């Protein structure tokens, strides 16, 4: 089974914020496969499960708020006995320009509180799909920035990148990670 986690904060107030780009992306990917999410209280998340191209897949959106995402991840990972190489986390990254996508396995959390939470519970040896949200301008507070909405042009750029990830997601299901990495650049 493949586990795909989209990071974000629950609630309508956060729905289109920069920090919720993981939720936005995972919903777009799930929609591509005509899946919908349902709440699973025992996992502290919203979940969509399917078999796609003979591959079991589980998409989750933790409902624990960003800083506690690891609690949801460990519950699902343990329940389904999923290995690290089959765990993919989609998240915002302020160190990448808006709309830029990078894929990597393992590494530092870069100060991202959702990744810190996951790392503290399961370690850092999982896959990451990083979506650039850019850095704040004019010494703007980072916390305020990540919780702000995109401008219309920024949102359009980010959605084009997310569509690129969704359109190439089948490569992950086929275990073609190098090809996926090259296609999403």
Swiss-Prot record:
Which cysteines link up through disulfide bonds?
A: none
According to the UniProt record, one GO cellular component term is: cytoplasm
Give the principal location in a single coarse category: cytoplasm
Q: What is this protein called?
A: Peptidyl-tRNA hydrolase
Q: What gene is behind this protein? A: pth
Tell me the classification of the organism that encodes this protein.
Answer: Bacteria, Pseudomonadati, Pseudomonadota, Alphaproteobacteria, Rickettsiales
EC number in record? 3.1.1.29
| GO biological-process terms attached to the record | protein quality control for misfolded or incompletely synthesized proteins; rescue of stalled ribosome
**Active-site residues (renumbered):** 19 (proton acceptor)
UniProt keywords (A-Z) are: Cytoplasm, Hydrolase, RNA-binding, tRNA-binding
Amino-acid positions noted as binding tRNA in the UniProt annotation, renumbered to this chain: 14, 65, 67, 113
- Protein role: Hydrolyzes ribosome-free peptidyl-tRNAs (with 1 or more amino acids incorporated), which drop off the ribosome during protein synthesis, or as a result of ribosome stalling. Catalyzes the release of premature peptidyl moieties from peptidyl-tRNA molecules trapped in stalled 50S ribosomal subunits, and thus maintains levels of free tRNAs and 50S ribosomes.
GO molecular function list: peptidyl-tRNA hydrolase activity; tRNA binding
């Amino acid at each position: 089974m493949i586990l795909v986690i989209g990071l974000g904060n629950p609630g309508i107030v956060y729905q289109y914020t920069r920090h919720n780009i993981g939720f936005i992306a995972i919903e777009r990917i799930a929609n591509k496969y005509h899946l919908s999410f349902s709440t699973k209280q025992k996992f502290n998340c919203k979940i969509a499960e399917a078999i796609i191209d003979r591959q079991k897949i589980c998409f989750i959106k933790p409902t624990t708020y960003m800083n506690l995402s690891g609690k949801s991840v460990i519950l699902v990972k343990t329940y389904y006995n999923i290995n690290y190489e089959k765990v993919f986390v989609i998240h915002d990254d302020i160190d990448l320009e808006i709309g830029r996508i990078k894929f990597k396995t393992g590494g530092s959390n870069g100060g991202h509180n959702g990744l810190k939470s996951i790392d503290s519970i399961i370690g850092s040896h999982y896959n990451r799909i990083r979506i650039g949200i850019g850095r704040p301008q004019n010494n703007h507070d980072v916390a305020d920035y990540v919780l702000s909405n995109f401008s219309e042009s920024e949102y359009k750029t980010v959605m084009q990148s997310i569509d690129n990830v969704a359109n190439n997601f089948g490569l992950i299901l086929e275990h073609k990670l190098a090809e996926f990495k090259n296609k999403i650049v």
